[in-house]
Amino acid sequence: MLYSKENKESYLEPVFGSSAEDRDIPKYTLGKEPLEPRIAYRLVKDELLDEGSARQNLATFCQTYMEDEATKLMSETLEKNAIDKSEYPRTAELENRCVNIIADLWHAPKDQKFMGTSTIGSSEACMLGGMAMKFAWRKRAEKLGLDIYAKKPNLVISSGYQVCWEKFCVYWDIDMRVVPMDKEHMQLNTDQVLDYVDEYTIGVVGILGITYTGRYDDIYALNEKLEEYNSKTDYKVYIHVDAASGGFFTPFVEPDIIWDFRLKNVISINTSGHKYGLVYPGIGWVLWKDESYLPEELIFKVSYLGGEMPTMQINFSRSASHIIGQYYNFLRYGFEGYRTIHQKTSDVAQYLAHAVEQTGYFDIFNDGSHLPIVCYKLKDDANVNWTLYDLADRLQMRGWQVPAYPLPKSLENIIIQRYVCRADLGFNMAEEFIQDFQASIQELNNAHILFHDTQQSGVHGFTH
C-alpha cells in the first residue's frame, strides 16, 4: 500500500499509542502545541471516567435523558444566540410560543396581558421575579407616601426555601423573613404568615415543591390569607410562586390543585424547563399575570445587530438550543404525553416509597403522591448502628447517588434521605435500585465496624 502522508501517526496509530500519551499534558496552563481532535476528545473523556452515572443520580431534579431527535435538534442549534432576535427571528418566535403555551397551562387570564421570558434556569427566573416585586412595591409605597428608606424592604418565605432566594435577598438588600417549618407544618405555615407581613413586604413566596421534601406550600390558603390582609390596607402584598419543580408537573398530574394565575394574588410564577419540563439543563421560565406587575424600568430596549428588542434578563448571550429543545417537547408530547410520562414517574415514586416503608426502618415524609419525591428518616426506635450517611455511602458504592442531609433550621436535628424520580427512572431500574437498597441495609446490619458521623455540618439549601 502506498501512502502520501508522511505523518502516519495521525491515522494509523491508536490514541493510546500516540505521542500525547507519552507525556503529561499540561492541565493548568495551555499546552505548547495543538492536539489532534480525536486525541483531545479521548483525553477529556478519560478525565470524566470516574464520575457517577447521571441516570443513577437520584439527588438531582435536572433532566438526564432526552430523545435522540431532541438531542440532535439541540446539537444542530448550539451556535444560535438566543439574544439575537433580529438574526434568528424564527427562534424568537419559538420562544414566544413557549411563553404562550406556559401561560395557557397556568391559566393566565384572557382579559389581561401576560408577560414572560426564558432564563437559564429557575434561579435566574426567581431573581427576575424578586426584582419585579421589589420595584413594584417601591412604586406603590412611594405613591402612598411611605418612607421607603426608613427600613429595608422584606420578603416572606418558608424555611424550606431554595438557596437562590437567600442570594436574591443578599444581592438586592432585602430582609428575608423566614417562617419556620415544624413537624406539624412541613411547608409554609399559612396560619403564621401574616405575622411576618407589613407595609415593607415586597411579596410572599409560595413554593410548589419544597426542594428538601417535595411537599407543596398551600398556595390557595396563602392567597386567602393575603386577600384578608389586602382588604384592610392600601399596602397590598402579592404572591410569587416558585414552581421550579411543580410548574411542569402539577398541571398534568393534579390539575384540581389551584395554585396558579387563577388565584387573585398570584402575580408571577417561575419554573424550570430542565426539571419536569423534560429538557437538559439549563432552561427556566418566568411569567407575570399582567404587564402591570412588571415595572417598565426593568425592561430594556436593546439595539443589537440591526434590531431593537425588549429584554428582561440578567444574562445576555446564551445558546438558543434549550429553548428549541423545550419547544420540541411541547410539540412532541402535547398535554396527554406530558400527563402520561409524569403519571408513570409518580407511580414509580410511590412504588419506591412503599418498598422503603416495608423494610420497617423508616418514617416516610413524602411518598411521591404529589411531586415524585421519596423522602424519609430513620425511625427513632430503628435500633441500628448505622446512619443515613452510612446508607448513602453504601449506595454510592453501587453507583447510586442518594443524598442524606438535615432539614432546614428549626428542624436541623432531623436527618433525611431523598430520591428524586425523573422520567428516565422506569420500574425496571427502580426494582434494581430497591435490590441494591436492601442489600446495602443488610451489609450495614452485618458490619462489625462502622465509621460514621451522626450529622453533617454546614449543609443547607439547594440550587435549582
Swiss-Prot record:
Molecular function (GO) terms listed?
Answer: aromatic-L-amino-acid decarboxylase activity; glutamate decarboxylase activity; pyridoxal phosphate binding
Kindly list any coiled-coil regions of this protein. Answer: none
Give residue numbers for the modification (N6-(pyridoxal phosphate)lysine): K275
Quote the cellular component terms of the Gene Ontology held in the record.
cytosol
InterPro entries tied to this protein = Glutamate_decarboxylase, PyrdxlP-dep_de-COase, PyrdxlP-dep_Trfase, PyrdxlP-dep_Trfase_major
- Check the UniProt entry and state the signal peptide residues, or none: none
Q: Which reaction does it catalyse?
A: L-glutamate + H(+) = 4-aminobutanoate + CO2
Q: What is its EC number?
A: 4.1.1.15
Could you tell me the keywords of this UniProt record?
Answer: Decarboxylase, Lyase, Pyridoxal phosphate
Statement: the UniProt record of this protein carries the keyword Repeat = no
Q: Which cofactor is recorded for it?
A: pyridoxal 5'-phosphate
GO biological process terms on file: glutamate catabolic process
**CDD domains per the record?**
DOPA_deC_like
PANTHER family associated with the record = GLUTAMATE DECARBOXYLASE
Q: What is known about what this protein does?
A: Converts internalized glutamate to GABA and increases the internal pH. Involved in glutamate-dependent acid resistance in gastric fluid.
Q: What is this protein called?
A: Glutamate decarboxylase beta
Identify the species of origin: Listeria monocytogenes serovar 1/2a (strain ATCC BAA-679 / EGD-e)
Q: What is the lineage of its organism?
A: Bacteria, Bacillati, Bacillota, Bacilli, Bacillales
